[in-house]
Design a protein with these regions (language model features):
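Conserved loop->alpha-helix
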Residues: 1-217
Length: 217
C-alpha cells in the first residue's frame, strides 16, 4: 500500500519492451534505502516489484496489463518519474490509501496559474470519472491530490508550489497522459452498493441467497 506522497523524482534509464511486456530501469537514490529485491515501488503511481538493485537505481518487470492500462509504455530514457516505496506498518500516513493498481489514464487539458497555485484540468473516461467527486481524493501519477471541480468530461485539481517542485506533474504539457487511480474506499462502496442492489432485485423476483442455498446452488 502507498500514500500518494512522492519520495523522490527518478529518471528512466531505459525501458525494454518485448511484445506487450518489458523491463523498466530507473535511476534513484532515496527509495533504495531499505529496499530489497521483491519489494514494491510505485512508479508514476504504478506498483512495480523490484527485480534487481544497483547502487544508483533499480529494475522492475512491467506486465502487459500494466502497459495497457498505464502511461509507462510511453516512457523513454531520461523521462522523469514519481517514486514512492510501499508504506511500512509503522510509517506515517500522509496522503490517502493508494493501492498502486491504477484504473486507467487521463489527458491533461490545460494548466493555468492562479497566484501561487496551478490549476491542472484532466480529461478521462466515464468509467473513471463517475467515481471522482469534488473534495474527494484522486491519485495522479502517484500523487495524492484533492479534487476541486468535476465536469462532464473531466476534473480539476489545484497544485501547490511544494507539490510542483517535488513531483513531475508541472513538468508535463497539455496533451500528455497521466495515470489515474480512483479512491479505493469509493470503489469498495460502489461494489457493495451494487451487490445490495442485485440482492434487492433478486428478492423482488423471488430468488434470494437462501433460495439458491436451499436448492444446492
Amino acid at each position: 500500500m502507498f500514500t500518494g506522497i512522492v519520495e523522490e523524482k527518478g529518471k528512466v534509464r531505459y525501458i525494454q519492451l518485448t511484445g506487450e511486456s518489458g523491463i523498466l530501469a530507473v535511476k534513484a537514490r532515496k527509495v533504495l534505502e531499505g529496499t530489497r529485491i521483491g519489494d514494491s515501488i510505485a512508479v508514476n503511481g504504478v506498483c512495480l516489484t523490484v527485480t534487481s538493485i544497483q547502487p544508483d537505481g533499480f529494475t522492475a518487470d512491467v506486465m502487459a496489463e500494466t502497459i495497457r492500462r498505464s502511461s509507462l509504455g510511453s516512457c523513454k530514457a531520461g523521462s522523469q518519474v514519481n517514486l514512492e516505496r510501499a508504506m511500512a506498518a509503522d510509517g506515517r500516513f500522509g496522503g490517502h490509501i493508494v493501492s498502486g493498481h491504477i484504473d486507467g489514464t487521463g489527458v491533461i487539458r490545460s494548466m493555468l496559474r492562479e497566484e501561487n497555485a496551478i490549476w491542472v484540468s484532466i480529461e478521462t473516461s466515464p468509467q473513471i470519472l463517475h467515481l471522482i467527486v469534488e473534495k474527494g481524493s484522486v491519485c495522479i501519477d502517484g500523487i495524492s491530490l484533492t479534487v476541486a471541480r468535476v465536469d462532464e468530461a473531466g476534473f480539476q485539481v489545484s497544485v501547490i508550489p511544494h507539490t510542483g517542485e517535488e513531483t513531475t506533474l508541472l513538468e508535463k504539457m497539455p496533451g500528455d497522459l497521466v495515470n489515474l487511480e480512483n479512491d479505493l474506499i469509493g470503489k469498495y462502496v460502489e461494489k457493495l452498493l451494487g451487490i445490495r442492489k442485485n440482492e434487492e432485485e433478486k428478492k423482488e423476483s423471488g430468488i434470494t441467497m437462501e433460495f439458491l442455498e436451499e436448492f444446492g446452488f
